[in-house]
From Swiss-Prot:
InterPro entries: DnaJ (IPR012724), DnaJ_C (IPR002939), DnaJ_domain (IPR001623), DnaJ_domain_CS (IPR018253), HSP40/DnaJ_pept-bd (IPR008971), HSP_DnaJ_Cys-rich_dom (IPR001305), HSP_DnaJ_Cys-rich_dom_sf (IPR036410), J_dom_sf (IPR036869). It comes from the Bacteria. Residues 357-380 are annotated as: Disordered. This is Chaperone protein DnaJ. One of its GO terms (molecular function) is heat shock protein binding. The keyword Cell cycle does not apply. The keyword Transferase does not apply. Zn(2+) 2 binds at C170, C173, C192, C195.
Length: 380
């Protein structure tokens, strides 16, 4: 059976923003979450929930969405780069989208029970700000980053208990990690306040890790930045967030892109803008000038009488965005510079030129003549 289109599954347009996609997923996740659907419709609701989660995971990731937009389902490998729609991690995306809004109803942060009846917690997501140049954003790059990580404590072998001792079953929750409270007609399930959901208490914590069972360290990750990425976009590295508890899945790492200010270009979507300074002689007489692009040099032919602020468009000399079929354009804005620090001889030549131009009147300076007439009308 063919998979449904991810955009159709979430009920959003193909150009939907990240926020629109997240809102649509939240709505569907709330509607179809298994804890809200019991009885005859439970199986269908679970399938719908998994479909929505899979669509959200693909479309909320810049790289995966770009691949899906270009190649469809064939462009995304379900065995790489993230959690699948099923398996023991199937409900992680719900916690990511909703946080702990429904903690008292569904359990804190979307946790599940492990094989021993203990609460299983998904690890927290981490964020990492990466600054790159405009050139790197346009062409993409492969790079490495170092992020905080956790290793199992070698002193206690990850148990959190002092060597020679062991963790005990929590007497408050009898090892379940949860307690049940009755409020009126409702029975509410909450995380055990004594063991914080682990189902165990440690009478004598390991001194090396303070009972955590893990030691903070660092690890190096390979990161592929797609060509055309823009300011504020995020790359998700699945499973590289904080580790889960009691065998729960790790959170994700979100790498947020920041682009350094460029000396020449300003980016606007897929388009680039730059200011080209020229002298009054070049502006007056015209001629060919060289302008920079991200791919090298290009040439613009200036007509005679080019005015300050005139814009020239070079098609295809912008940036090809991650979800664009064609590159944007480069807009060159002319800035006519007034000469400074003139010699007396140069001043004399300019005065002579000015006198000569005044004789031509409107023919040489049509805008000045029009402006003068408007000023006269203002003071009539």
């Amino acid at each position: 059976m063919a998979k449904r289109d991810y955009y159709e599954t979430l009920g959003v347009a193909k150009n939907a923003s990240e926020e629109d996609i997240k809102k649509a997923y939240r709505k569907l996740a709330m509607k179809h979450h298994p804890d809200r659907n019991q009885g005859d419709g439970a199986k269908k609701a679970e399938e719908s929930f998994k479909e929505a989660k899979e669509a959200y995971e693909m479309l909320s990731d810049a790289q995966k969405r770009a691949a899906y937009d270009q190649y469809g389902h064939a462009g995304v490998d379900p065995n790489m780069g993230g959690r699948g729609a099923g398996g023991p991690e199937a409900y992680g995306g719900f916690a990511e989208a909703f946080g702990d809004i429904f903690g008292d109803i569904f359990g804190q942060n979307g946790q599940r029970r492990g094989p021993g009846g203990q609460q299983v917690y998904r690890g927290n997501d981490l964020s990492y700000a990466m600054e790159i140049t405009l050139e790197e954003a346009a062409r993409g790059k492969d790079t490495q980053i170092r992020i905080p990580s956790w290793d199992s404590c070698s002193t206690c072998d990850g148990t959190g208990a002092k060597p020679g001792t062991s963790a005990k079953t929590c007497p408050t929750c009898s090892g379940s990690g949860q307690v049940h409270l009755r409020q009126g007609f409702f029975s509410i399930q909450q995380t055990c306040p004594s063991c914080h959901g682990t189902g165990k208490i440690i009478p004598e914590p390991c001194t090396a890790c303070n009972g955590a069972g893990r030691i903070k360290s660092n690890k190096t990750l390979e990161v592929k930045i797609p060509a055309g990425i823009n300011e504020g976009m995020r790359i998700r590295s699945a499973g590289n967030g904080e580790p889960g508890t009691n065998g729960g899945p790790a959170g994700d790492l979100y790498i947020e892109i920041r682009i350094k200010a460029h000396d020449i270009f300003e980016r606007d979507g897929d388009d680039l803008h730059c200011t080209i300074p020229i002298g009054i002689a070049t502006a007056t007489l015209g001629g060919a000038i060289e302008v920079p692009t991200l791919g090298g040099k290009a040439e613009i032919e200036l007509p005679e009488g080019t005015q300050h602020g005139k814009t020239f468009r070079l098609r295809g000399k912008g940036i090809k965005g991650v979800r664009s079929s064609y590159p944007g354009d480069l807009y060159c804005h002319v800035a006519v510079e007034t000469p400074i620090k003139l010699t007396e001889h140069q001043r004399k030549l300019l005065r002579e030129l000015d006198e000569s131009l005044k004789k031509g009147g409107e023919r040489h300076s049509p805008n000045a003549k029009s402006w003068t007439d408007r000023v006269k009308d203002l003071f009539k």
